[in-house]
Swiss-Prot record:
The lineage of its organism: Bacteria, Pseudomonadati, Chlorobiota, Chlorobiia, Chlorobiales. Gene3D superfamilies: 3.40.50.880, P-loop containing nucleotide triphosphate hydrolases. It catalyses: UTP + L-glutamine + ATP + H2O = CTP + L-glutamate + ADP + phosphate + 2 H(+); L-glutamine + H2O = L-glutamate + NH4(+); UTP + NH4(+) + ATP = CTP + ADP + phosphate + 2 H(+). CTPSs have evolved a hybrid strategy for distinguishing between UTP and CTP. The overlapping regions of the product feedback inhibitory and substrate sites recognize a common feature in both compounds, the triphosphate moiety. To differentiate isosteric substrate and product pyrimidine rings, an additional pocket far from the expected kinase/ligase catalytic site, specifically recognizes the cytosine and ribose portions of the product inhibitor. This is CTP synthase. Its EC number is 6.3.4.2. Residues 1-272 are annotated as: Amidoligase domain. Residues 299-543 form the Glutamine amidotransferase type-1 domain. GO terms for cellular component: cytosol. The keyword Ligase applies. Mg(2+) binds at D76, E146.
Length: 565
């Protein structure tokens, strides 16, 4: 019997303040290790008590990232997929709520044999068991675990205790901690201050963990003197104090960490000797295209309900960066608050001045719906490139029904259960569902595309797989009416029952999709829908008026390939 592979573990923690970029750090390190020939996986441990973020407000949590297997997860998993070009799964995101639920379920089944169930050992052992199971997946060399929250938060203590025990059991050469901290720059003193980092490390020491590597976020580069000071007071080798100053784009972070030799320090500490030199020319080319676009810029308006919190649209915004690079343009994003468009005095021409394309974003509930519909009407009537995603497709259907098909009171039963013309209705298998968490149509599903459509022009294939997160769907009772009025149903489920893509033939670019293309766009594989949309916006900005744009996929950033099911 073959001996199990000795998987190396890297835990990434954060201190001083939140939002330092632990997810970007984890994804960047994973990408560097993968480029050296190692098999790497990343997971996120979130300390909140929710089982998953699926029922959390976007204002509190940001975007819910959906995996191929239907998990509703943290948005950091999007960074992992975009940087590593590897798909995550249900097991890639563990919440404290899921841990507690599992422990309580086991207690109810009598699996603890009458013991008093406690955080130590039962909750901690549950975390360690989950970690051991994840390490068995995929013949891994390295498993990176990002622990959410900030050192000092009471919620994350069980995760830290599990890490402490694992390090003791596995040894320093099999598990290391990378601690991300903040070194503020005080303008009045013209100095970088290390004291917050020192205190953060002391808090980590207070739970029994000595960090192996410190990554210090800062506004300005760290001098050798500062690195030496941090290392001296935090009991870390100066070579293991890594500077990470602000940069123009998050996609430069791997290149900065490579320059700081973070990956080499990790390899040495974990005793990993068989590796190759990384080839990152494609990554440098991508960053150059992002920073120095050759064909100017375009501006896309994102009409949504959560525009005060851009993280609610994180993957959409990142997808525009990818599509901008593939089209050699910079994509500026303007967030458009849907509710504002419902005001009688709202001036669309003024609000959309300089806008080269309109995207109506996903969401739930009736707030701002009429504003979204008005933006869609403007895009349709003024031949402005338009893309609707999920709820955006449903709103596009409502707008078309009202203003083209003559169904004046058309609506979705989500917003008006008594509407005379329910062009959007609850899916049949959803009508008896009572619980909200994890019960939508979630994950990757196949879609058949019609030849000769705009969708086929960007995908160049008949069968695609895309990720979904919805309960409502187009009502097929109205399909004939729509088709007679000029709507093209260019993508459906294989049995033809579920509408996945709609588009207008006599429009520059009017495409709406029920799925979430933003969840599958990556640095090396720009999503075809976003590439095509930005290409249309680019032509619109340049004053080209042909109706059927020829969209060529780029050579630098290849088209999304068929995923493995």
């Amino acid at each position: 019997m073959a001996r199990p592979k000795n998987v190396k573990h890297i835990f990434v923690t954060g201190g001083v303040i939140s939002s330092l970029g632990k997810g970007i750090l984890s994804a960047s390190l994973g990408m560097l290790l993968k480029s050296r020939g190692l098999k790497v996986a990343i997971q996120k441990y979130d300390p909140y008590i929710n089982v998953d973020p699926g029922t959390m407000s976007p204002y509190q949590h940001g975007e819910v990232y959906v995996t191929d297997d239907g998990a509703e997860t943290d948005l950091d998993l999007g960074h992992y997929e975009r940087f590593l070009d590897e798909s995550t799964t249900q097991s890639s995101n563990l919440t404290m709520g899921r841990v507690y639920k599992s422990v309580i379920d086991k207690e109810r089944r009598g699996e603890y044999l009458g013991a008093t169930v406690q955080v130590v050992p039962h909750v901690i052992d549950e975390i360690k068991d989950r970690m051991a199971e994840q390490a068995k997946n995929g013949d891994l060399d390295v498993l990176i675990t990002e622990i959410g929250g900030t050192i000092g938060d009471i919620e994350s203590l069980p995760f830290l205790e599990a890490m402490r025990q694992m390090k003791l059991e596995m040894g320093d050469s099999n598990l290391l901690n990378i601690h991300l901290t903040f070194v503020p720059y005080i303008k009045a003193a013209s100095e970088l201050k290390t004291k917050p980092t020192q205190h953060s490390v002391k808090m980590l020491l207070g739970v029994g963990i000595q960090p192996d590597i410190l990554v210090c976020r800062s506004e300005k580069p760290l001098s050798r003197e500062i690195k030496n000071k941090v290392g001296h007071f935090c009991n870390v080798n100066e070579l293991d104090v890594i500077g990470l100053n602000d940069c123009d784009t998050i996609y430069e972070v791997p290149l900065m960490l490579l320059k700081e030799k973070l990956d080499l320090r990790v390899l040495k500490k974990l005793g990993l000797k068989k590796y190759k030199e990384p080839t990152l020319d494609y990554w440098r080319d991508f960053c150059n295209k992002v920073k120095f676009p050759q064909d100017g810029e375009v501006t896309i308006g994102i009409c949504g309900k959560y525009t005060e919190y851009p993280d609610a649209y994180k993957s959409i915004i990142e997808s525009f960066i990818h599509a901008g690079a593939s089209n050699n343009v910079k994509v500026n994003v303007k967030l458009l608050r849907a509710e504002d468009a419902e005001l009688n005095a709202f001036d669309f021409a003024k609000e959309l001045e300089g806008i080269n394309g309109i995207l109506v974003a996903p969401g739930f509930g009736d707030r701002g719906i009429e504003g979204k519909i008005k933006y869609i009407q403007y895009a349709r009537e003024h031949n402005v490139p338009f893309l609707g995603i999920c709820l955006g497709m449903q709103c596009a259907s409502i707008e078309f029904a009202r203003n083209v098909c003559g169904l004046q009171d058309a609506n979705s039963t989500e917003f008006n259960k008594r509407t005379r013309f329910p062009v959007i209705d609850l899916m049949a298998h959803q009508k008896k569902v009572k619980e909200k968490g994890g019960t939508m149509r979630l994950g990757s599903y196949p879609c058949i595309i019609s030849e000769g459509s705009k969708a086929y022009a960007v995908y160049h294939k008949f069968l695609i797989n895309e990720r979904h997160r919805h309960r409502y769907e187009f009502n097929n009772a109205y399909r004939k009416n729509f088709e007679e009025s000029g709507m093209v149903f260019s993508g459906t489920s294989p049995n033809g029952e579920l509408v996945e893509i709609i588009e207008l033939k006599n429009h520059r670019w009017f495409v709406a999709v029920q799925f979430h293309p933003e969840l599958k766009s990556r640095v090396q594989k720009v999503h075809p829908v976003f590439h095509g949309f930005v290409a249309a916006a680019k032509e619109y900005a340049h004053g080209v008026h042909q109706m059927d744009l020829v969209v060529e996929m780029p050579s630098l950033v290849p088209v999304l390939t068929e995923p493995t099911q």
